[in-house]
């Protein structure tokens, strides 16, 4: 069975799907990521945030976007405060309809 077939099966049975998030920061310092997360909350409370440890880096990702266009729109809105923000594809939580 192919990887994509397995991925489709997992996403069908769960509340997950292939989508996009915005990577705000990836740093070796957890303290720096926490500081950026606090700054992010002040401006964008309505987006879900995900702090992920991907050795040796801690990453701050935001959003559960179904399309690249939607994620790009939000990334553009963040550029003035978070210049390094960019869109990444990954498994995201499906939004409730």
Give the location of each predicted region:
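Acidic/polar low-complexity segments and flexible, solvent-exposed patches
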Residues: 1-97
